[in-house]
């Protein structure tokens, strides 16, 4: 019988291995390599992610143009990478949004984790944009 997987054990197992040449929306954060998207994730990896508990955190950064961001887990530990394909719901995440998600091990070594099935549970008071709204590179068009 295997030991239950808790968010603390998943995050503390090994620190994420980061690609040294990757850049993220926040200069101090590094992107994992390879980046696994919902489309490229295998069925078995997706099934394992669904076995993991739902955890909570806060969006640290998210770039709609780059298609990724990072979540700071409420339980502490390393910030978790999040790909745009794993965001569920109608709103684009913004820094400060509270989210719930599951951790998914990233192949081939399954040492790193990323956030999947990400749902915004509490929006920041700032104006949020829906995915279907036109995007103008961070600024609104002149009226």
Swiss-Prot record:
Residues 1-30 are annotated as: Disordered. It holds the Pfam family CSD. Keywords: Phosphoprotein. Residues 54-121 form the CSD domain. One of its GO terms (molecular function) is mRNA 3'-UTR binding. One of its GO terms (cellular component) is cytoplasm. PROSITE patterns: CSD_1, CSD_2. It comes from Drosophila melanogaster (Fruit fly). The keyword Phosphoprotein applies. GO terms for biological process: dendrite morphogenesis; regulation of mRNA stability. The keyword Phosphoprotein applies. This is Cold shock domain-containing protein CG9705. The modification Phosphoserine is found at residues 22, 24, 28, 33, 139-140.
């Amino acid at each position: 019988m295997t030991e239950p997987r808790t968010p603390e054990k998943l995050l503390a197992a090994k620190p994420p291995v980061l690609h040294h040449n990757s850049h993220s929306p926040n200069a101090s954060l590094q992107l994992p390599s390879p980046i696994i998207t919902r489309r490229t994730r295998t069925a078995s990896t997706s099934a394992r992610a669904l076995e993991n508990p739902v955890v909570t955190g806060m969006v640290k950064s998210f770039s709609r143009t780059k298609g990724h961001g990072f979540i700071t887990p409420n339980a502490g530990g390393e910030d978790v990478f999040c790909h745009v394909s794993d965001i569920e719901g109608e709103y684009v995440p913004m820094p400060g949004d509270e989210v719930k998600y599951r951790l998914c091990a990233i192949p081939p070594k399954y040492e790193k984790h990323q956030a999947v099935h990400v749902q915004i549970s509490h929006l920041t008071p700032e104006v949020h944009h829906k995915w279907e709204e036109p995007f103008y590179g961070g600024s609104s068009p002149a009226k």
